[in-house]
């Protein structure tokens, strides 16, 4: 298989603070990965480096056969879709939904004297329709609910027809119904034969949609587990990743985790050892 992403011995520090330590990670074509860990584990930092939004302090990063440091990232970014609350925060409340989606064609937030052709308009409408958001096309961004915004953000991330798609905690802040609708949409995208390779950042196993194939778990900036989902999402690995005894269950394509009584703490120590 062809590698779409390869991180080799990647580290990142800010002053004396080590954020990532010697991260190795390879994503092959057709794989869909979950980046899992607690708050501050380094998930979003790894995703930002892997999506060419941040340079590491050391190590090498190859994205879509281009090496960071040797490529103009402004030319690479349109090939990489990104759903992030940080991007959404930059959208003006008065911006129309159609404009939010269309502007991704130019790799910017908001419109700035762009002219869109019929292909762009048709694609934007088709994506919104496929995600159950066609009725929002003329609404202003500031009037949307959290669930509606996520669907529009996903349409925007898919607008350039990316080769990779990064989803940074897409279900954060959503109610149960909105979360399940979003996860179902992601599963449908994955099932398409021309789906981009996806990377989902989360700290909840319950937010992993059906169809994801692999997981990379992080703790304090270091890799704990990496590989096929069923091999990584075990009680031992997840307990070590989150630093407490956890039970992991799997039912009808979905994972869940819950805490175990304090007496099971020895299990975490053994997993670390």
Locations of the language-model features?
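Conserved ABC ATPase "signature" region
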Residues: 117-136
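ABC ATPase NBD coupling module
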Residues: 67-81, 114-117
């Amino acid at each position: 298989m062809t590698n779409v992403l390869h991180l080799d011995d990647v580290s990142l520090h800010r002053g004396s603070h080590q954020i990532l330590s010697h991260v190795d990670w390879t994503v092959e074509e057709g794989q869909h990965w979950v980046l899992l860990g607690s708050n501050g584990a380094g998930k979003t930092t790894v995703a930002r480096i892997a999506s060419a939004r941040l340079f590491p302090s050391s190590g090498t990063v190859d994205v879509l056969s281009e090496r960071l440091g040797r490529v103009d990232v402004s030319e690479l970014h349109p090939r990489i879709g990104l759903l992030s609350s940080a991007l959404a925060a930059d959208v003006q409340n008065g911006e129309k939904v159609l404009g939010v989606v269309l502007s991704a064609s130019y790799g910017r937030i908001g419109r700035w004297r762009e002219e869109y052709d019929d292909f762009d308009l048709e694609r934007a409408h088709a994506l919104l329709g496929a995600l159950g958001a066609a009725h929002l096309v003329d609404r202003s961004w500031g009037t949307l609910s959290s669930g509606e915004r996520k669907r529009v953000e996903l349409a925007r991330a898919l607008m350039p027809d990316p080769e990779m798609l990064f989803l940074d905690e897409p279900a954060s802040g959503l109610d149960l119904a909105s979360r399940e609708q979003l996860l179902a949409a992601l599963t449908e995208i994955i099932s398409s034969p021309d789906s981009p390779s996806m990377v989902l950042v989360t700290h909840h196993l319950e937010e992993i949609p059906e169809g994801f194939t692999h997981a990379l778990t992080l703790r304090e900036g270091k890799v704990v587990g990496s590989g096929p989902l069923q091999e990584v999402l075990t009680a031992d690995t997840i307990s070590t990743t989150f630093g407490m005894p956890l039970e992991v269950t799997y039912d009808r394509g979905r994972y869940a985790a819950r805490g175990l009584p304090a007496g099971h703490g020895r299990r975490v120590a053994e997993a670390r050892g």
